[in-house]
């Protein structure tokens, strides 16, 4: 995958020991068997060896719930303090997560939505532990600095609606586009800023064409892999020429391999006038908190972890949604109302 290799210098930066999943030859064998590949990816093949070698006082498991399959049966499980911190973002709660609750004393989830659901099932020891972010990195610039920042990106009196997200299917891109289209009819100066990668997940150009939205009204973030500068402008394809350093084919939409720094991301929030985050479900959705620290009004789907961030005291407005069921899992998912996005 895109993980850090064992011999990478990055493994030397933290105060921890790193272990590789397996030998290259063994990895090739695991790839052929989907379940074994997944288990190895979660560290299941080395956990016993690591416990024996390090003799830890505390085991902290921060993974999807299926990563801990039968860990409670291991001889070391009840001999040390064990804690899991897992993402539960939809109702009904995943059966594996419910079954594991009585098997671990310290059970943490990422949102009070999940804590509430688990307690309704009788598991009062489940608690919420939220993901952390550096609050010193996200703040609102004074109006003069915001004006200069916007002008540096060719923006003057436009009204910018922003959405920071990984381009995944659970992020409701069609919904925000439809809501923006309705809003644009009432506010001619509106622009939509999608800080995401345009070469994965939703085919955004196709959606814009289907919805008859002018591509020039939808902005995105480009990052140069050479000079690390960023540009805010309409999408015009990948591997563009950087306007700052002049490098050819080094400018791409922000992505997991090359993104912006926290300082740059804070600047991008400061380009916005309002932040909108529609999604089907989520564990925490940290960009919502970053936007709040930047003193933006946030519009958030009122489901899953969104329930925590669209309350009156949180500085956010709830977005209405309709239920649909995810095939296979039968999870309840949210389809955010485009009209409510427009009205809010």
Language-model regions, residue ranges each:
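Short His-centered aromatic/hydrophobic patch
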Residues: 61-67
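N-terminal strand-loop element at the rim of the active site
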Residues: 1-41, 197-205
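A short helix/loop element that forms part of the nucleotide-sugar donor recognition site in Leloir-type
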Residues: 139-154
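Nucleotide-activated donor-binding/catalytic signature segment of Leloir-type glycosyltransferases, i.e.
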Residues: 75, 202-267
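Aromatic "clamp/platform" in nucleotide-sugar-dependent glycosyltransferases that forms part
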Residues: 280
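Carbohydrate-associated surface elements
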Residues: 113, 132
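Conserved donor-binding/catalytic core segment of Leloir-type glycosyltransferases
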Residues: 155-171, 177-180, 192-196
